[in-house]
């Protein structure tokens, strides 16, 4: 019995515009700009591709695509905007660990609003290794209902780890829900926060 092997449906739908090869098989040389536009590259002879696409893409699109690639692939671990922190809630304690190494205690504001803790950090423009930078972030976490809000504390370790903690009360006792600011104290030793 003969079985006909057909191309996948998405290849047939694009017809001649879909390339039949994978990046011209130049695996060790990286991508050319025309490899990112396969529907155009398959209709143009390889002899003309390099100069044609180089002319078109030298108009600024290449720089934009390169910038977008670097933004998508840069690490964001130290940025609180992209680092939600670690939250631990066990039987007798609630703790939040947040990496804020670019901020001093004066740059941080920690508030408790009903059942939420809000952590806001902002520093004005300052110089670093690459030029001038200003940073700002805002994080909001829900507090468990049995956290004693009158005993909440917040500290910033020498390595820039903010630790917000509060004990949990036994069920049936008042947890003291109200709005108040929590001062951020500085510790001289590095944090004992869990690593990722």
Curated annotation (Swiss-Prot):
One of its GO terms (biological process) is response to UV-A. This is Alpha-crystallin A chain. The gene is Cryaa. One of its GO terms (cellular component) is nucleus. It comes from the Eukaryota. Contributes to the transparency and refractive index of the lens. Acts as a chaperone, preventing aggregation of various proteins under a wide range of stress conditions. Required for the correct formation of lens intermediate filaments as part of a complex composed of BFSP1, BFSP2 and CRYAA. GO terms for molecular function: identical protein binding; metal ion binding; structural constituent of eye lens; structural molecule activity; unfolded protein binding. It is found in: Cytoplasm; Nucleus. Residues 168-196 are annotated as: Disordered. Glycans are attached at residue 185. The lineage of its organism: Eukaryota, Metazoa, Chordata, Craniata, Vertebrata. The modification Phosphoserine is found at residues 45, 145.
């Amino acid at each position: 019995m003969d079985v006909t092997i057909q191309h996948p449906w998405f290849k047939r739908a694009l017809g001649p515009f879909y390339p039949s090869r994978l990046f011209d098989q130049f695996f060790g040389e990286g991508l050319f700009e025309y490899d990112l536009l396969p529907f155009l590259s398959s209709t143009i002879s390889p002899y003309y591709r390099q100069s044609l696409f180089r002319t078109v893409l030298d108009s600024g699109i290449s720089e934009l695509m390169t910038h977008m690639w670097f933004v998508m692939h840069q690490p964001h671990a130290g940025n609180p905007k992209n680092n939600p922190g670690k939250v631990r809630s066990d039987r007798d304690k609630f703790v939040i660990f947040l990496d804020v190494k670019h901020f001093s205690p004066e740059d941080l504001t920690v508030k408790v609003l009903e059942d939420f803790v809000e952590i806001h950090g902002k520093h004005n423009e300052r110089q670093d290794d690459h030029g001038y930078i200003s940073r700002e972030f805002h994080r909001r976490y829900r507090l468990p209902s049995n956290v004693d809000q009158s005993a909440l504390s917040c500290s910033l370790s020498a390595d820039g780890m903010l630790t917000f903690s509060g004990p949990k009360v036994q069920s049936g006792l008042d947890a003291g829900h109200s709005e108040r600011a929590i001062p951020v104290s500085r510790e001289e030793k590095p944090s004992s926060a869990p690593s990722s």
